[in-house]
Amino acid sequence: MNGVEVPAKIQKRIERLREEINDHNYRYYVLSQPTIPDSVYDELFHELQKLEKKYPETITPSSPTQRVGAEPLKVFEPVHHEIPMLSLDNVFDEKGLRAFDKRIRQRLKLDKPFEYVCEPKMDGVALSLLYENGELIRAATRGDGYTGENVTQNTRTIASVPLQLRGNDYPELVEIRGEVLMPREGFAKFNREAEKRGDKTFANPRNAASGSLRQLDPRITAKRPLIFYGYLIGLLKGKDFPKNHCDVLKWFKDWGIPVISEIKVVGGIEGCLDYYEHLVKTREKMPFDIDGIVIKVNSLQVQAELGFVSRAPRWAIAYKFPAQEKMTVVKAIEFQVGRTGAVTPVARLEPVSVSGVTVSNATLHNFDELYRKDVRVGDTVIVRRAGDVIPEVVGPILAKRPKKAKLIKIPSRCPVCHAEVIKPEGEAVARCMGGLYCRAQLRESIKHFASRRALDIEGLGDKLVELFIQEKLIKDITGIYQLKKSAITALPRMGEKSAENLLTAIEKSKKTTLPRFLYALGIRGVGDTTARTLARHFHELDLLMKASIETLQEIRDIGPVVAENIHAFFHQKHNAELINKLIHLGVHWPQEKAVVKSEIAGKTFVLTGALKSLTREEAEEKIERSGGKATSSVSKNTDYVIVGENPGSKYEKAKALGISLIDEEAFLKLLKS
């Protein structure tokens, strides 16, 4: 107590800060849905620390400065941390780092520099792994630092976490603490696949790691690309601590625990500053997000002497990078059309500098995200930029929302080609149905149209497609069949022979099959198997183009979403015009024959290995034409597995399931039947 009466205004501000910080902790740690940048959170926390330092009589046991994090969720079994999982204090500039070094040396009464260990500050989820006699017996999240959540079953699915420690030089009991991360590449792939499925995407790798680790179903966690890195020992029984922290990390490596490679032992604070500058320059080359560096006293004996304050160790500090999140205002929300027809809302922003880059546009990912985040025109929002990732809007600051903030609706027409835009129920992504006609989708449409399973135009690769579009030789998909030799030979590295070969391949592609043509159209959800199913059902293109959604849904393996996609595609006037033009230019196929009764009809086949007389595509096509079904994986529903040369794992699985195995000769006899 300092004997000074606390002004009412100050008391009110302290209470308000505690409320805000506790709320943000809940959103960050429990919901994995932060609504403010880390830099803003740090400012609030430091303001509260300063006020409590000035007025110590205001400090209460429940103040955020006296504890870590938030309450654990009730759905997981609680785990008590025998040694609290404390977070680190932060500094944001060289002055703060030098002050940290000075405090340590004064406390130890040392004038000369001593060793620190510098590590990247990983931007993931803290995790405690408990091993008994080398076996993983428990994994727990940090929670509030004292009580976490038991996530053992989920953690067992992370490939980088050993279920049994390597060697035999491990202690009777050891608690290994570290960080669970989702690498940038895995995060980008996960979000791409989630968007394709119409599922929820994550705003950043940290949220993805947290959400994945805290799934109630371990099977979901198992599908997420998570990694774990160890950085500290908590409990230890049956073995003495080594001399230094870097020796602990060597133990981890020996036991099979991953340790981040960019760790350096330095002599004194100058070495720490050099390490920081190095990581500022190289951070984007790292496979995962980092938001600063961690500096620890290397000597474990010195760590013990320095001890802890209530919230953090005295022997370590986090030196954070400049904020990669800033606040700005949404001036407008516009729509971009991607290569596959995905219509993405994009925020046009008041320009703001984030990590040294001026940001004036930011993605909102999809309409589910737009509405979940509730971003409106006129909102003050948080913008994040991490590495090469496109800047994104994290969320609005609701307290700053103007009364006239405008809610955006999904556009009914494509902003590029004015075709219908549809968003199937249950999917996150709205899509343009312009298909063949939409200029935004032109490149991908042509590449797909010419691909091996479609019209199979040999020599018309990605680079040549790009060149034809760039030179305006192809303006829509029918332009492939209107290319002239003189125009092709005028292009770089395209001689007469190359032009002749390409034109020959284009001419050859005109003779195709109805399933290949349907697949080539690039209708969303219509793969080559579905294309064969449609061709076998309707026999004629005209009948398919006139089919209702109800008729389409009656077909085996075609659900409501794919039925709607097919119907919408063929009912776009421009798509129908381009299909007719392709036929007028000579694209044709033999009449699909009705399936006659055969031994193949109604049976499911899987191919493994190479056939001598047929390609895989030809074999699958013949199966479908005969009324059978060709699939890519073996299951209890498979009737026959066709075994070619050098069969793969499907052969072994079929044997284990007792499924009929036939060779190429037997398959050809079935076809003749």
Curated annotation (Swiss-Prot):
Pfam families, A to Z: BRCT (PF00533), DNA_ligase_aden (PF01653), DNA_ligase_OB (PF03120), DNA_ligase_ZBD (PF03119), HHH_2 (PF12826), HHH_5 (PF14520), Nlig-Ia (PF22745)
Keywords linked to the UniProt accession: DNA damage, DNA repair, DNA replication, Ligase, Magnesium, Manganese, Metal-binding, NAD, Zinc
Cross-referenced InterPro entries: BRCT_dom, BRCT_dom_sf, DisA/LigA_HHH, DNA_ligase, DNA_ligase_AS, DNA_ligase_CS, DNAligase_adenylation, DNAligase_N
Binding site for NAD(+): 38-42, 87-88, 119, 142, 179, 296, 320
Catalytic residues (positions): 121
EC number(s) per entry: 6.5.1.2
GO biological process assignments: DNA repair; DNA replication
Gene Ontology CC, one term: cytosol
Catalytic activity line of the entry: NAD(+) + (deoxyribonucleotide)n-3'-hydroxyl + 5'-phospho-(deoxyribonucleotide)m = (deoxyribonucleotide)n+m + AMP + beta-nicotinamide D-nucleotide
An MF annotation (GO) of this entry: metal ion binding
Domain of life (superkingdom): Bacteria
BRCT domain location: 595-673
Binding site for Zn(2+): 414, 417, 432, 438
EC class (word): ligase
Reported cofactor(s): Mg(2+); Mn(2+)
Gene3D superfamilies (alphabetical): 5' to 3' exonuclease, C-terminal subdomain, 6.20.10.30, BRCT domain, DNA ligase/mRNA capping enzyme, Helix hairpin bin, Nucleic acid-binding proteins
Record function comment: DNA ligase that catalyzes the formation of phosphodiester linkages between 5'-phosphoryl and 3'-hydroxyl groups in double-stranded DNA using NAD as a coenzyme and as the energy source for the reaction. It is essential for DNA replication and repair of damaged DNA.
Family: Belongs to the NAD-dependent DNA ligase family. LigA subfamily.
Stored NCBIfam families: dnlj, PRK07956.1
Name the record gives this protein: DNA ligase
